[in-house]
């Protein structure tokens, strides 16, 4: 058991080092997925021997260990293959190669620089969904890895795979799920694509899909941007209608289709800061922000730091905090709020301190990775 604990500690040290390094080198991300694979192999072996804990770590069930190890192996192999191509010279962040990004449409492809578009079903703005058009899609074809741009038409969002259009979002299928009339409108920036049956004139673009996508990203100013994708022969502009002024944000984070009335899917990438009260904001190490609020003096309270981020990162970080036990009173397990979307980066841990001095000393000494965010506060004292 002692040997397994030591190996697990070494793996988790490597994982946390990868988070803190925030590397843009693909070889570092290969090392990360190797460490994740090894971590889950250790968990699997421990569970096979009926061990439910390794040190202070709870051992997941066999099915969870196996599933996570398989994902790590799949991504490790894909990255090792991609590393042998000319694309290994590009910048790759950990969020570009994370599990959620890998399984976001188009699945089992690497993707970069997503642009949001809106689709209104049944012509109603209140029944709209959001989708992502990727500037770059990296897929493994018959001749190895290829880099292409995705584009949008009235039918859906697609990219060219081995000379053929591959739709990863089909608006007709989406309209069946979310609409009643089987019609929809596509809105991207100041341009719109409407149902061809609803107008008498037809607009055709002579610009190829790839050219249009690249042109869009080379003009990011809202007033001069060109639409992502191309208007196909079946798409039309409504005569006498001014372009919509909806301007979606450009982001690298990955989101799947959402509607106003439905929960949105989680983004793979975590933001480094929380939006807190700007009137009492401080800047902390790692780009985090904090918010001090007035506490009713009638209650006995303790200063705390809430740390938000991806669950596995927080677990590793909590483990590393044990080296600084003298700098805090206690630390919670990983948790999340139940009334919000349980996204990848919506997990929390809370660190409790005996006084403000101890908390400040903790923040000065303990290295906090930029991939998580901090919020300072106070909590009513509990048994500790």
Swiss-Prot record:
Q: Which Pfam families match?
A: PPV_E2_C, PPV_E2_N
The segment annotated DNA-binding domain runs over 301-384
Sorted UniProt keywords: Activator, DNA replication, DNA-binding, Early protein, Host nucleus, Isopeptide bond, Phosphoprotein, Repressor, Transcription, Transcription regulation, Ubl conjugation
One cellular-component annotation, GO: host cell nucleus
Q: Where in the cell is it found?
A: Host nucleus
Positions of crosslink type Glycyl lysine isopeptide (Lys-Gly) (interchain with G-Cter in SUMO)? 308
- According to the UniProt entry, which residue ranges have a biased composition of type Low complexity? 251-263
Alphabetical list of Gene3D superfamilies matching this protein? 3.30.70.330, E2 (early) protein, N terminal domain, subdomain 1, Papillomavirus E2 early protein domain
Decide whether keyword Transmembrane is in the record: no
Q: Where is this region: Transactivation domain?
A: 1-200
Tell me a Gene Ontology molecular-function term this record carries.
Answer: DNA-binding transcription factor activity
Q: Describe its PTM?
A: Phosphorylated. Sumoylation plays a regulatory role in E2 transcriptional activity.
Q: Composition bias, kind Polar residues: at what positions?
A: 220-237
Region annotation (Disordered) ranges: 218-292
Question: What HAMAP family has UniProt attached to this entry?
Answer: PPV_E2
Task: Report the family membership.
Answer: Belongs to the papillomaviridae E2 protein family.
| Assembly, per entry | Binds DNA as homodimer. Interacts with protein E1; this interaction greatly increases E1 DNA-binding activity. Interacts with protein L1; this interaction enhances E2-dependent replication and transcription activation. Interacts with protein L2; this interaction inhibits E2 transcriptional activity but not DNA replication function E2. Interacts with protein E7; this interaction inhibits E7 oncogenic activity. Interacts with host TAF1; this interaction modulates E2-dependent transcriptional regulation. Interacts with host BRD4; this interaction mediates E2 transcriptional activation function.
- Function as written in the Swiss-Prot or TrEMBL entry: Plays a role in the initiation of viral DNA replication. A dimer of E2 interacts with a dimer of E1 in order to improve specificity of E1 DNA binding activity. Once the complex recognizes and binds DNA at specific sites, the E2 dimer is removed from DNA. E2 also regulates viral transcription through binding to the E2RE response element (5'-ACCNNNNNNGGT-3') present in multiple copies in the regulatory regions of the viral genome. Activates or represses transcription depending on E2RE's position with regards to proximal promoter elements including the TATA-box.
Protein's recorded name: Regulatory protein E2
Q: Which organism is it from?
A: Human papillomavirus type 53
Q: Tell me the name of the encoding gene.
A: E2
């Amino acid at each position: 058991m002692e040997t397994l604990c030591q190996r697990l500690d070494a793996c988790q040290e490597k994982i946390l080092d990868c988070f803190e390094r925030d590397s843009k080198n693909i070889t570092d991300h290969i090392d990360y997925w190797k460490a994740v694979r090894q971590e889950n192999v250790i968990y699997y072996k421990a569970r096979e021997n009926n061990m439910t804990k390794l040190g202070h770590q709870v051992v997941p069930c066999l099915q969870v260990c196996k599933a996570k190890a398989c994902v790590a192996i799949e991504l490790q192999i894909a990255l090792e293959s991609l590393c042998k191509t000319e694309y290994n010279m590009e910048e790759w962040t950990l969020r570009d190669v994370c599990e959620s990004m890998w399984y976001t449409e188009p699945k089992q492809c690497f993707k970069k620089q997503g642009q949001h578009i809106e689709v209104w079903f049944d012509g109603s703005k209140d029944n709209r969904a959001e989708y992502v058009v990727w500037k770059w899609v990296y897929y493994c074809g018959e001749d190895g890895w290829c880099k292409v741009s995705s584009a949008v038409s009235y039918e859906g969002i697609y990219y060219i795979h081995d000379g053929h259009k591959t739709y990863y979002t089909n608006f007709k299928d989406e309209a069946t799920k979310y609409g009643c009339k089987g019609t929809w409108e596509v809105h991207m920036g100041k341009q719109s694509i409407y149902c061809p049956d609803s107008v008498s004139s037809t607009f055709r673009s002579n610009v190829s899909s790839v050219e249009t996508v690249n042109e869009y990203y080379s003009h990011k100013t809202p007033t001069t941007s060109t639409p992502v994708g191309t208007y196909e022969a079946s798409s039309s502009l409504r005569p006498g209608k001014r372009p919509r002024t909806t301007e979606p944000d450009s982001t690298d984070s990955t989101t799947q289709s959402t509607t106003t009335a439905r929960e949105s899917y989680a983004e793979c990438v975590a933001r480094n800061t929380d939006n807190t009260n700007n009137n009492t904001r401080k800047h902390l190490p790692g780009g985090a922000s904090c918010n001090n609020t007035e506490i009713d003096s009638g209650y006995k309270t303790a200063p705390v730091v809430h740390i938000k981020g991806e669950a596995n990162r927080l677990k590793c970080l909590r483990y590393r905090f044990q080296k600084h036990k003298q700098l805090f009173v206690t630390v919670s397990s990983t948790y999340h709020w139940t009334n919000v979307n349980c996204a990848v980066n919506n997990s929390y841990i809370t660190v409790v301190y005996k006084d403000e001095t101890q908390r400040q000393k903790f923040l000065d000494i303990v290295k906090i990775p930029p991939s998580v965010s901090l919020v300072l506060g106070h909590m009513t004292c509990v048994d500790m």
